[in-house]
């Protein structure tokens, strides 16, 4: 199987894991432990290492711009902490957007846990970063969103989270301990931070299987969205402002590692589109089979922070036998996704249309098609 071999990953976290509980041979401590040894950090590292046991995990202090230059093998990372709980797109969100845009590293962020029943449910910072993949929590025994999993979109109005997955993990054979803050680690962890560590581990495994996705966060996000095929029972009733079909299902590895076709376009702002469109054909289509297609693109955080909107608005259209079979044309999202069944065996004509363009930022556009 695929185990993250050859892949480096980062965790941004002020606490440190207890070394007797984790695999220290695949763990590199690059920062001082500002919060000492913590239950939370131990749990995050355990989940990641269980999911991608051969990946090397580099720990950085909490922050949105880890200095990864000295470790070029780092391809993926995760942030399982939160800063702000309101609707504002903050400097931390901007900094993470810039980090992903400049370094081409796929970064996962926790959607956040709503601890108060009267709270606002806004996705927490830095999970509002548009280039990041924000992860909601699903209870594995019901396949429903956790009641505490945050879902409300920021002032930018882009849909968050983009994915949601299992958030409850148990390591019954781990030795219990009391951490440096007086909290007891008992091998059990639950929350969106756990789902985030798990997602980063899954992506490390994908990079092991398909190196093509390395250094392409725009394709990685499209892949995670199209691979979210296992339906979440209460997705529509839980996430009230997500009208797209992202984060309505759980990513399954079999639908990330197999049965997909991917491509990307990269260059200066004026590249890649003929007029306002990119048009191509998908062949070997099978009638009545299910297809999911997503596009995703990266943007500079500074523009989003200044203008509170996306610098490029790109839409997705799928045509078969001269008829538009599916389309997704949101105005605020940095991704589009469609889910449909083929009407015939005819080729699909894919049209990616840049509906609006500020002229700011490069074209960094990823595409993925999944088929059952």
Q: Would you name each region that the model predicts?
A:
Residues 5-9, 52-57, 72-77, 102-107, ...:
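Loop/turn elements at helix/coil->beta-strand transitions in domains of secreted/extracellular proteins
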Residues 163, 208-290, 306, 326-335:
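C-terminal subdomain of the subtilisin-like protease fold in secreted/lumenal serine endopeptidases
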Residues 1-32, 163:
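Acidic-leg catalytic submotif of subtilisin-like serine proteases
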Residues 291-307:
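Short amphipathic, basic-aromatic surface patches that mediate peripheral association
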Residues 334-342:
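Beta-sandwich interaction modules
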Residues 14, 28-95, 136, 216:
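Subtilisin-like peptidase catalytic core
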Residues 13-15, 122-207:
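Extracellular S/T/G-rich loop segment that most often corresponds to the catalytic His/Ser-adjacent loop
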Residues 219-223, 278, 308-309, 317-320, ...:
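C-terminal edge strands of extracellular/lumenal beta-sandwich accessory domains
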């Amino acid at each position: 199987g695929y185990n993250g071999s050859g892949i480096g990953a980062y965790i941004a976290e002020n606490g440190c894991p207890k070394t007797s509980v984790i695999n220290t041979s695949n763990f590199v401590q690059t920062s001082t432990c500002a919060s000492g040894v913590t239950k939370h950090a131990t749990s995050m590292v355990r989940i990641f290492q269980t999911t991608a046991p051969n990946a090397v995990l580099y720990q950085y202090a909490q922050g949105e711009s880890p200095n990864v230059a000295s470790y070029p093998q780092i391809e993926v990372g995760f942030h399982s902490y939160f800063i702000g709980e309101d609707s504002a797109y903050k400097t931390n969100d901007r900094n993470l957007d810039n980090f992903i845009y400049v370094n081409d590293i796929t970064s996962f962020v926790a959607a956040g846990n709503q601890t108060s029943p009267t709270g606002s449910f806004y996705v927490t910072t830095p999970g509002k970063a548009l280039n990041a993949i924000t992860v909601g929590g699903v209870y594995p025994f019901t396949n429903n969103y956790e009641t505490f999993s945050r879902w409300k979109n920021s002032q930018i109005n882009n849909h968050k989270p983009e994915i949601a997955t299992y958030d409850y993990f148990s390591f019954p054979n781990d030795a219990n301990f009391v951490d440096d803050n007086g909290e007891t680690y008992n091998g059990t962890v639950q929350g969106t931070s756990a789902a985030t560590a798990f997602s980063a581990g899954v992506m490390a495994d994908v990079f092991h299987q398909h190196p093509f996705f390395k250094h392409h966060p725009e394709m990685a996000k499209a892949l995670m969205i199209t691979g979210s095929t296992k339906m979440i029972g209460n997705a529509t009733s839980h996430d009230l402002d997500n009208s797209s079909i992202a984060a309505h299902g759980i990513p399954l590895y079999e639908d990330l590692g197999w049965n997909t076709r991917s491509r990307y376009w990269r260059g200066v702002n004026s590249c890649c589109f003929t007029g306002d469109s990119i048009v191509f054909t998908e062949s070997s289509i099978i009638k009545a089979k299910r297809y999911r297609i997503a596009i995703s693109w990266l943007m500079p955080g500074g523009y989003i922070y200044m203008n509170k909107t996306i610098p490029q608005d790109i839409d997705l259209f799928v045509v078969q036998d001269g008829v538009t079979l599916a389309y997704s044309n949101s105005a605020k999202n940095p991704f589009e996704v469609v889910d449909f069944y083929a009407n015939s065996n005819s080729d699909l004509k894919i049209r990616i249309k840049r509906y609006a363009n500020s002229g700011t930022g490069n074209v960094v556009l990823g595409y993925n098609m999944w088929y059952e």
